């Protein structure tokens, strides 16, 4: 089985759980925005490709499974999120997309309660005051927003803190 993973070089320890646990790491392909040096040091038998998850550099149906773990909220607004889903569906026979649940009261990136529910200008001001200006770039999704990104049938599992979309 071949498995592609957009967002393969994250700074968070949970980002690489697949590479750490999958029994056949030589069958994985990870994709990230960075040059992949840290990733290659940690996972030398897993292929790493530098690229954009919204414009994947792979052929149609190149992978049995595409798994995107908490990437979609970082790619930009809706048009970019739709592009990520479209590309994942193009290159993978099955697709799994996870994302933090917008309707969970504590935002997982900042660990701030309720701020992400404020109107955007107020939330952005709160992120600045909390010295987390990077959080303004996150575009969180709820179950209906995640479902709307998929052009066809998709299963959405609400795990309370996070959502999983699977085809």
Predicted features and spans:
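Class I SAM-dependent methyltransferase SAM/SAH-binding core
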Residues: 2-55
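A conserved beta-strand element that flanks and buttresses the S-adenosyl-L-methionine
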Residues: 67
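Short catalytic micro-motifs in class I SAM-dependent methyltransferases
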Residues: 70-74
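A short, conserved alpha-helix within the catalytic core of class I
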Residues: 75-92, 99
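Conserved class I S-adenosyl-L-methionine
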Residues: 87, 94-121
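C-terminal alpha-helical "lid/dimerization" subdomain adjacent to the S-adenosyl-L-methionine
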Residues: 109-147, 157
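Conserved S-adenosyl-L-methionine
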Residues: 152-162
């Amino acid at each position: 089985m071949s498995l592609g993973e957009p967002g393969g070089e994250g700074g968070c320890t949970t980002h690489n759980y697949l590479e750490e646990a999958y029994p056949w790491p030589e069958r994985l392909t990870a994709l990230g925005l960075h040059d992949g040096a840290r990733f290659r040091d940690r996972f030398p038998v897993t292929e790493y490709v530098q690229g954009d998850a919204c414009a994947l550099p792979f052929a149609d149906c190149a992978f049995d499974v595409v798994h995107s773990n908490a990437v979609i909220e970082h790619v930009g607004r809706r048009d970019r999120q739709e592009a990520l889903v479209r590309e994942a569906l193009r290159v993978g026979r099955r697709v799994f997309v996870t994302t933090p649940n917008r309707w969970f009261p504590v935002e997982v990136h900042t660990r701030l309660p309720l701020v992400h529910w404020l109107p955007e200008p107020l939330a952005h001001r709160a992120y600045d005051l909390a010295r987390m200006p990077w959080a303004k770039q996150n575009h969180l999704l709820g179950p209906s927003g995640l479902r709307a990104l998929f052009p066809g049938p998709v299963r959405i599992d609400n795990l309370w803190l996070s959502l999983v979309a699977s085809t």
